């Protein structure tokens, strides 16, 4: 359970507008992360949003149910924010092979792309993020 929590934190909590990390640096690291194996079933995660200056803006908990059919992983996410707001997102992730993934969700612009090596996953996408009564387009580079 501790390793599952650790990977959840890595995947969902650490994001920035630009990244100097390189997925190749994780090649051969253990334990090997296989996205579809990791997220099948129930997963809990916690996360945060921070501004470009590193100031904490918001925290959340997310309950995730993952199901696999053919070469598709579906993640049904239910968010609860620290201010009581609730939200949800359903990811449809295609398992492309060679440690590569692509995904869509209703608030994602275009298609997300992902690649894994060793015990890491890099997941990139553009999201229409709700802020008050409006939305802003945000680039995510999740590790």
Question: Which role does the model predict for each range below?
Answer:
Residues 13-16:
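C-terminal motif of bacterial Sec signal peptides marking the signal peptidase cleavage site
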Residues 20-28, 81-143:
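Calycin-type beta-barrel ligand-binding domains and close structural analogs
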Residues 43-50, 78, 124-130:
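Generic short beta-strand segments
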Residues 37-61:
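Post-signal-peptide N-terminal segment of Sec-exported extracytoplasmic proteins
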Residues 62-92:
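Short, well-structured hydrophobic secondary-structure segments
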Residues 2-10:
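Sec-dependent signal peptide recognition
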Residues 26-42:
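N-terminal helix-cap/turn-to-beta initiation motif at the start of protein domains
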């Amino acid at each position: 359970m501790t390793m599952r929590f650790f990977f959840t934190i890595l995947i969902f909590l650490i994001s920035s507008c630009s990244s100097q990390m390189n997925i190749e640096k994780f090649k051969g690291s253990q334990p090997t992360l296989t996205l579809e194996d990791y997220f099948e079933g129930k997963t809990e995660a916690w996360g945060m949003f921070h501004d470009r200056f590193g100031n904490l803006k918001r925290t959340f908990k997310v309950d995730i149910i993952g199901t696999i059919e053919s070469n598709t992983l579906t993640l049904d996410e239910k968010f609860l924010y620290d201010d009581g707001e609730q939200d949800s997102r359903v990811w449809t992730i295609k398992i492309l092979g060679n440690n590569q993934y692509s995904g869509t969700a209703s608030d994602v612009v275009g298609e997300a792309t992902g690649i894994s090596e060793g015990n890491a996953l890099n997941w990139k996408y553009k999201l229409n993020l709700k802020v008050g009564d409006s939305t802003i387009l945000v680039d995510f580079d999740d590790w």
